[in-house]
Amino acid sequence: MYIKPKKFNKVLVANRGEIAIRIFRACSELGIKSVGIYSKEDKYALFRTKADESYLIGEDKGPIDAYLDIDGIIDLAKKKNVDAIHPGYGFLSENPEFVRKCEENDIVFIGPSADIMNMMGDKINSKKIATEVNVPTIPGINHPIRDYEEAKNIAREIGYPIMLKSSNGGGGRGMRIVYEEGSLEIEYQTACSESKKAFGKDIIFIEKYISNPKHIEVQVLGDRYGNIVHLYERDCSVQRRHQKIIEYAPAFSLDENIRKRICDDAVKIA
């Protein structure tokens, strides 16, 4: 089915700092008016002066919460006749509730749909998707662990060390490394508790732990017409507590054949 392309006349950038400036510039180059938002703490920040229009958001909120004010951002977008919202990265960029609010108010969210976010935001589900298209995954399971006894049996089958992971985890949280069976029970209980507290769910699965791996990510870009391309890879291996510190591209340590396979696999999953 043909979907007529929609021309954007005005785009709101729901972010701050350098990424907001980059999006403002892209809008300018495309002849699109840009709308910026800023917290009261950012009143004199450089980025707010780079948008065609700029408005205070979340006046009664803190410097971070202001940029997480979904209702406030949507209300402003409607008042200013915004066609689309670009989330940048961080903040609301991976929040399916924000995407649904945009859809409900006939505002285009420049990014994945809420369904895709929910689908790929669940690590167990994303492993299933990768398996379905014959993309290799780390040895482990692709279903939630029911209890400690099941965790013990699976760990024995996979072999130690293993990693307990929250299916809804992110940002370096929700992971526990277990080197031997003697510490599995306490680590399993801790993983469930941390996952419940941080992500609202205690859904845990197990993977083989790989020491000092190369953490390679591939950026993909798709449109509503089914066209998908990759934008090559970046190396995110420099980490502290499972949180990325430095990313660089290209990943110069990759063999060319492996690079092609990884990028092709990313497109297959997308």
Kindly label every feature range from the protein language model.
Residues 1-270:
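N-terminal beta-alpha lobe that positions the nucleotide/phosphoryl donor
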